[in-house]
Regions:
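Nuclease catalytic cores that cleave nucleic-acid phosphodiester bonds
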Residues: 2-151
């Protein structure tokens, strides 16, 4: 088992590394040339800056039983299709039971944004310690489940 992080602007990299160290699970950070990262624990793979290049690279190297961390529903859907586990940086698990609805909501929201002529889209709220704790608990629970499923 490995953990793969769609690491462009991902706020939970250090949390993932700390928890993964406890379980001796290798971590791979994937980023494009606009977001070069370094890590003492994780392998870092830098991909060209093309649209979705990081996403496609991540999916090409993840396998059944791996854990994928991404805020991209499309990446999560492809990871689930390969038998990997997938989690959002909020701690919400992507599952085969919820991914179709999430993709449909994303599509409808994108359609609504296109038709509304609004140019400004409000960004996410500032991340809190509670957000980090929620993610850490959810991620650790996912690791335990993934380890059990390997047995």
């Amino acid at each position: 088992m490995r953990v793969f992080i769609d690491a462009d602007a991902c706020p939970v990299v250090s949390i993932v590394e700390n928890i993964s160290k406890k379980y001796n699970i290798p971590v791979t950070l994937l980023c494009d040339t606009n977001h070069v990262l370094t890590s003492e624990y994780s392998e870092v793979i830098v991909v060209g800056a093309g649209a979705d290049a990081v996403d496609y690279k991540l999916i090409s190297i993840c396998h059944r039983g791996d854990i994928v961390i991404s805020q991209d529903y499309g990446v999560a859907a492809m990871a689930l299709g390969k038998g990997a586990f997938a989690i959002h940086q909020s701690g919400k698990w992507y599952t085969n039971d919820n991914i179709d609805q999430m993709l449909m909501e994303r599509h409808l929201n994108k359609k609504a944004r296109r038709s509304s002529h609004k140019n400004h889209i409000k960004g996410p709220k500032k991340r809190t310690e509670e957000d980090d704790e929620r993610f850490a608990q959810s991620f650790e629970k996912m690791i335990r489940m993934a380890v059990e499923s390997e047995m």
